[in-house]
Amino acid sequence: MGRGPKKHLKRLAAPSHWMLXKLSGTYAPRPSAGPHXLRESLPLXVFLRNRLXYALCGREVKAIMMQQHVQVVGKVRTDTTYPAGFMDVITLEATNEHFRLAYDVKGKFAVHRISAEEAVYKLGKVKKVQLGKKGVPYVVTHDGRTIRYPDPLIRANDTVKIDLATGKIXSFIKFDTGRLVMVTGGRNLGRVGVIVHREKLEGGFDLVHIKDALENTFVTRLSNVFVIGTEAGKPWVSLPKGKGIKLSISEERDRRXAQQGL
């Protein structure tokens, strides 16, 4: 009987959104313990080697990171298996590049480059609001942050804008009808739309009805909804290619044909 934490991860058991080839080895890099769960994160080794192709192997990734060229959310990271997750900002000082991890409509983490002005903050979904010792209020975000003395109007499911230099809340968005949201789980992962209606179910999961830019309506759980803007067309963060609009197979075919001039 095995005891203790698991230290290995078979490549076939790795999350599909890492997009690792089945025949390129027996094992995959297992994410370290960190702010994001294993199946909701992307190890820095996979990001640098497989997505950016800045390294050919894990040894080269280690050499890059030990030179302290890689920052995640404003802090230097030297662990090649550090788990970066949704809304995290990855900075490469050597090339002066900034990336934000966000989902595309295929459910994969997109390589989304952002400007230096946008790289100074991130968004966090409020998971709970509580009182600590001596009555000190605090909020806990989706990435494990605990922020004390928040605005009294902040509630669960709201989104806070976090300044990476200070770690403090700069502003927040209330969860309400008409807000621009991105889906972070389920079959609609990566889609972006506006909240139309929140359906409360007794003894079950609350459902949220969302309408995208093409007037298509879909439903997902409340736990999968992440507010990213106050209204349609005005997100607080730039969106990856596709802008969160999911097309059918025939619509994608027609778009490719139009781009090729056929």
UniProtKB/Swiss-Prot annotation:
UniProt cross-references to InterPro entries, sorted A to Z: KOW, Rib_uL2_dom2, Ribosomal_eS4, Ribosomal_eS4_C, Ribosomal_eS4_central_region, Ribosomal_eS4_central_sf, Ribosomal_eS4_KOW, Ribosomal_eS4_N
Pfam families: 40S_S4_C, KOW, Ribosomal_S4e, RS4NT
HAMAP family: Ribosomal_eS4
Assigned protein family: Belongs to the eukaryotic ribosomal protein eS4 family.
Gene3D superfamilies: 2.30.30.30, 2.40.50.740, RNA-binding S4 domain (3.10.290.10)
Keyword flag rRNA-binding: yes
The protein, known as: Small ribosomal subunit protein eS4
Entry GO MF terms: rRNA binding; structural constituent of ribosome
Gene Ontology CC: cytosolic small ribosomal subunit
Keyword annotations: Ribonucleoprotein, Ribosomal protein, RNA-binding, rRNA-binding
